[in-house]
C-alpha cells in the first residue's frame, strides 16, 4: 500500500515513525514550508521534515495546497491512501485523490472537541477522559466518519504536556491499526451523529491565542487550576498581579498550581506570600497556590526560588 504522510509538529513524528519502522511504504511526506526563526531568522525545519530527512523520505513542502505543480506531483505518486496528523485543512482535490481516501488522527474522542486545541480544552473543562480518533476526511473540518477510537484517563496530576505525550504514542498505534484495517477491507466507519444523542453537549476546541491564556480570576479555584493545567507547558496561562514593593502589576506565566477550597476574608485576586516560601492568590472560594512560574525576562522557576529573588 502506497502511503503519503502529511504532518508538521512533534506530535506527528511518532505516527510517521511507527510506519517507517514497520516497513510500510511511505512514498512521500508533505509538511509545512521552512520558516525563519530566532534572532538570525535562520530557516527552521518542522519536526516531521527533520525525521523525513533522517530516513531519506521524499519531502514536499507546498506553499499552497492547490498549487498545480504540487497537485501534479501528488498525482504522480499514485498513493493508495493519505494519512494526516497535525497538518492543515486540505482542499477536496487533495483529500479525494487516493483510491482509498484520506484519514486524519485527531487528539480527542470525536465528535467532542472538534478544532485546533482538543487536548488543552479537555483538561481546561475538567474532563476525566479523552482519547484519539481516526476518521475519513470530508468537507467540514473534523466531522468525517470515525474509523477507530481509543480512550485514556486524564489524571489529576496531568497537564497538556503529559496528555499530549501519551496521545502521541496511542495515536501512532491507532494510525497503524487504521491502515491495517483499511488495507484488509475491514473498515466499518461510523457516522459521528451516531455518537450524539439528545442529551449530548458538544464541546469545541477553538484555537488558543495569547489573550485566551489570561486567567479569569472570577472563576472557582478548581476551574482556574484546571485552566493552568490545560495551558501547561504550552501556550501557558498568565495573569497580571501586584508584587510586594511594586506600584505596577507584573505579568506572570503560571505553569503549575495547587488549590484549597476554603472561606476567607482576603480581597479577590490578592497575592498572599507566607515566609517567602509559598505564594497564593485569593479567589472567591479559596486559594490558588503558585508552584512554578515565570516572570518577564526570567527563567521558569519554582515559587520558593522566585520569592527569594524578590526585594
Residue ranges of model-derived segments:
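Internal alpha/beta domain cores that form substrate/cofactor-binding pockets in large enzymes
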Residues: 2-4, 27-29, 58-77, 82, ...
Amino acid at each position: 500500500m502506497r502511503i503519503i504522510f502529511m504532518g508538521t509538529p512533534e506530535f506527528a513524528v511518532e505516527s510517521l515513525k511507527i510506519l517507517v519502522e514497520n516497513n510500510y511504504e511511505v512514498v512521500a511526506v508533505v509538511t509545512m514550508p521552512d520558516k525563519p526563526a530566532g534572532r538570525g531568522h535562520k530557516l527552521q525545519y518542522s519536526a516531521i521534515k527533520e525525521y523525513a530527512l533522517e530516513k531519506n523520505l521524499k519531502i514536499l513542502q507546498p506553499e499552497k495546497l492547490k498549487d498545480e505543480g504540487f497537485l501534479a506531483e501528488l498525482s504522480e505518486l499514485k498513493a493508495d491512501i493519505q494519512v494526516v496528523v497535525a497538518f492543515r485543512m486540505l482542499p477536496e482535490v487533495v483529500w479525494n485523490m487516493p483510491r482509498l481516501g484520506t484519514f486524519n488522527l485527531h487528539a480527542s474522542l470525536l465528535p467532542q472537541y472538534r478544532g485546533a486545541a482538543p487536548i488543552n480544552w479537555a483538561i481546561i473543562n475538567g474532563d476525566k477522559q479523552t482519547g484519539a480518533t481516526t476518521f475519513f476526511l470530508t468537507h467540514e473540518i473534523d466531522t468525517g466518519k470515525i474509523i477507530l477510537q481509543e480512550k485514556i484517563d486524564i489524571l489529576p496530576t496531568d497537564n497538556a504536556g503529559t496528555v499530549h505525550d501519551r496521545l502521541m504514542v496511542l495515536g501512532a498505534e491507532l494510525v497503524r491499526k487504521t491502515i491495517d484495517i483499511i488495507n484488509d477491507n475491514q473498515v466499518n466507519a461510523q457516522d459521528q451523529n451516531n455518537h450524539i444523542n439528545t442529551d449530548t453537549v458538544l464541546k469545541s476546541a477553538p484555537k488558543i491565542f495569547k489573550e485566551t491564556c489570561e486567567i479569569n480570576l472570577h472563576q472557582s479555584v478548581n476551574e482556574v487550576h484546571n485552566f493552568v493545567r490545560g495551558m501547561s507547558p504550552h501556550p501557558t496561562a498568565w495573569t497580571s498581579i501586584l508584587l510586594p514593593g511594586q506600584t505596577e502589576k507584573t505579568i506572570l506565566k503560571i505553569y503549575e498550581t495547587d488549590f484549597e477550597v476554603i472561606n476567607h476574608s482576603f480581597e479577590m485576586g490578592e497575592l498572599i506570600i507566607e515566609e517567602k516560601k509559598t505564594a497564593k492568590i485569593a479567589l472567591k472560594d479559596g486559594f490558588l497556590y503558585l508552584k512554578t512560574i515565570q516572570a518577564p525576562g526570567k527563567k521558569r522557576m519554582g515559587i520558593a526560588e522566585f520569592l527569594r529573588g524578590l526585594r
